[in-house]
Amino acid sequence: MSVSVIVDGIKLTLNPFMSTLTGNVVSAIAGSLKTQEGKKFEFVMRGEELQLFVDDQEIPLSLGQARRIVGNVFRGLLSSLHGAETGTEFRFIFEP
């Protein structure tokens, strides 16, 4: 399992706990959104905008409430990560 959190183009170093937690969260959210199976899941967050890519193909996120909830979950994760405090673009990448 490979997990990356990239803030404004800079990959953050995650300890084993945060790596596992982030991977589990990304996987669970993608599954809850009923996405197709894939080898790479990537959430991109810029302000209130949230995009999901599965194997580099964008998956439309049309549910406003789901988008807001997912954004809040990711903001919660980011609040615990050193190096994410002043970022404007956040990428969560999970490759099972």
Model-derived features: where do they sit?
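Conserved mixed alpha/beta catalytic, RNA-binding, or beta-rich assembly cores of soluble enzyme
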Residues: M1-P96
